[in-house]
Amino acid sequence: MKRVQNLLVAVGLSPNYHRRTYPSGKKSLVVRFYATLTPGLEDVAAKEVESFGCKVEEIRERRGRIFFSGEKSAIPLLNHFSRTLERLNVLLLRCEVEGLDDIYAAVKGLDFSFVKGKSFAIRSLRVGEHDFTSMDIARVAGQAVIDSFMESYGERLKVNLNQPDVIIRVELVDSELFVGVDTTGDDAMHKRWWRVYNHPAHLNAAIACGMLRIADWKVDESLIDPMCGSGTIPIEAALMVRNVPNLRDFAYKKLCEWELAFEPNEVRLKLYGMEKFRKHLVGAIRNAVNAGVADTIEFRQGDATEMTGEYDVIITNPPYGLRIHRKGAIERLYHSFARAAKRCMNQNSRLVIITAEHRVFANAAEEAGLQCTHERFVKYGGLLTKIMVFMI
């Protein structure tokens, strides 16, 4: 626990730290964080962060960033139990800069005592127009960390670019500089521990969870993904309700020790996954078994355009048809699927999809008699996709 305090003391030396006094008279350390996430899901992630007792201070809409404060226990809790975040950083510094000299001075002014005896690496990001690169930022910031530690402790810190003990994020967005300690690591949170089979176009797990929250799916409602691929949506739905954490190792474990305690909820759910191709169906079942939720998901082989039954919530990530010669096939698929989905819906059912071909699907849904009740753009990789919700 002493190592935890070392990290937080470093935060305490910046203006981004205060102590909160509770009625009992006890004082609790409150830390400022910034998290990165899928652009377009900021409000969804903010609500999730608040459910962990954190206070959201700023939401950067469509920029994939939220800023908030919370107790130090938020570090393991959010890394393991957040469903929609990508990366959690302890915010060391946030300021305006004009160039590389300002970046060097800002970083050099921080206390890096928490890196003592450890290796570190800078991970840099640059957004906007500048006369230097992100590599220049990493070089200058790295030298600033080394110089700061040398002046304070007379030792040279070890640099390890491949497997550092501590990752320091130095990110410049236009003229605003953010410096933080990455508690997640190089692999973002959406890389789930349970995935042993990858569909060639599998859905980002954090986006899948965002869609579940946008759908306002409830535990007693039936849910199907009729084009489930490797099973991401029903698997994440089961893990969310059963309170199963992301069991990966995260970067914070090299800075502090925390015992992960959780009590899974063994509730049985009405979850269904349908997939046209047997290879992917078998892969989805393997993923569900590895996640420990195969007992509550019914997988079946079938065509989404011929789905039957009645479901409260339908959530899916259909093919986008990015190759020109598939455009016609995608239009036919969307029209057939929209009609099939409507047949399986009641007056309270919701159909939630994500696609880059949102105009095509909107037309298909309208022709099928579905009403769009919600839509939002979401940046998925290099694509501008749209999540849409439809009802009868």
Curated annotation (Swiss-Prot):
Keywords: Cytoplasm, Methyltransferase, RNA-binding, S-adenosyl-L-methionine, Transferase, tRNA processing
Key word tRNA processing present: yes
Record GO biological process: tRNA methylation
Gene Ontology molecular function terms on file: RNA binding; tRNA (guanine(6)-N2)-methyltransferase activity
Stretches assigned to the THUMP domain: 73-183
A Pfam match: RlmL_1st
Substrates-to-products reaction catalysed: guanosine(6) in tRNA + S-adenosyl-L-methionine = N(2)-methylguanosine(6) in tRNA + S-adenosyl-L-homocysteine + H(+)
InterPro entries: DNA_methylase_N6_adenine_CS (IPR002052), RlmKL-like_Mtase (IPR000241), RlmKL-like_Mtase_CS (IPR053943), RlmL_1st (IPR054170), SAM-dependent_MTases_sf (IPR029063), THUMP_dom (IPR004114), tRNA_guanine-N2-MTase (IPR053485)
EC number(s) given by UniProt: 2.1.1.256
Enzyme class: transferase
Annotated function: S-adenosyl-L-methionine-dependent methyltransferase that catalyzes the methylation of the guanosine nucleotide at position 6 (m2G6) in tRNA.
Family assignment from sequence similarity: Belongs to the methyltransferase superfamily.
Protein name: tRNA (guanine(6)-N2)-methyltransferase
Organism: Archaeoglobus fulgidus (strain ATCC 49558 / DSM 4304 / JCM 9628 / NBRC 100126 / VC-16)
